[in-house]
A protein has these predicted regions:
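Hydrophobic residues at beta-strand termini and immediately following loops
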Residues: 15-17, 108-110, 184
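Inter-lobe coupling linker of SF2 helicases/translocases
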Residues: 1-84
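A conserved SF2-helicase RecA2
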Residues: 158-231
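Conserved beta-strand segments of the P-loop GTPase G domain that flank and frequently precede/overlap
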Residues: 89, 134-135, 153-155, 184-185
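Alpha-helical elements of the RecA-like P-loop NTPase motor core of helicases
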Residues: 25, 70, 97, 118, ...
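A short beta-strand element within the Helicase C-terminal
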Residues: 143-156, 179-183
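Conserved nucleotide-binding/hydrolysis micro-motifs of P-loop NTPases
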Residues: 20-23, 94-95, 113, 138-140, ...
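Conserved helicase ATPase core of P-loop NTP-dependent helicases/translocases
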Residues: 77, 85-89, 96-98, 104-140, ...
Length: 231
């Protein structure tokens, strides 16, 4: 896409989040409770293991998003102090609301009436807001946010391509300079989802180059089941 449309560069960087000892213990304890509850119900035959595994993955990602909020807030505050316009994407409305309460800025989620969403984007594009916080489901498609030079992904959606689509709301014709994409990472849920995204990119590259290599890939529910069973 970048070569075809003569777009400026897009640079992606992974930012591991470091927790204090107390925060790390609290984070791991909450994850462990979710996993143990899944195992009990799965062993008792109370749930479909594949469907429940995805629900648990969502819960683990949501816990991770909560613990990444201070790091995300610090990063955004630093960028704003430098005069940068920033877009933040998250899968979770609660995380978006908490971040907006802490930093201000515009909020774009499914709880905003459809008729009002474009006006929020327009205010950001016009420079009336330096920060736009959005969920993937609302802001990740259809809008142009190319005023931002920085986009922060609190976590990534597991559907291949959705992270790229969200970044590309800012990576548009008419933007000035390199787009910096910041991926915050914390815990095994992020490792799994980001690994799937990297795997998808490798498959596309092989397809485009007509490579003959065969890549084994399990369905996501099975991968999550194995992760939870081996926890």
């Amino acid at each position: 896409k970048q070569d075809c449309l003569d777009l400026p560069p897009k640079r992606r960087q992974m930012l591991p989040v470091t927790l204090s000892e107390a925060e790390g213990q609290g984070f791991q304890h909450r994850l462990q409770l979710k996993v143990e509850d899944y195992r009990r119900r799965a062993a008792a035959g109370l749930v479909r293991r594949d469907a429940e595994a995805l629900a648990v993955l969502t819960a683990l990602r949501q816990i991770g998003a909560e613990y990444k909020l201070p790091a995300a807030a610090d990063l955004v505050a630093q960028l704003q102090a430098e005069g940068q316009a920033v877009v933040v994407f998250t899968a979770f409305v609660a995380a978006a609301q908490l971040l907006q309460q802490r930093l201000g800025g515009a909020l774009l989620t499914g709880r905003l009436a459809a008729a009002e969403r474009q006006s929020v984007v327009d205010r950001f594009q016009a420079g009336e807001e330096q920060l736009l916080i959005s969920t993937y489901g609302v802001g990740g498609l259809g809008f142009t946010l190319h005023r931002a030079r920085h986009v922060v992904l609190l976590e990534r959606p597991w559907t291949p391509g959705d992270a790229e689509q969200a970044e590309d709301r800012c990576h548009r014709i008419g933007m000035q300079g390199t787009l910096e994409c910041h991926w915050l990472q914390l815990g095994v849920a992020d490792q799994l989802v980001d690994g799937l995204i990297a795997d998808k990119a490798e498959r596309i590259a092989l397809l485009l180059s007509r490579g003959q290599a065969q890549l084994d890939r399990q369905p996501l529910p099975r991968m999550v089941q194995q992760l939870l069973d081996q926890w």
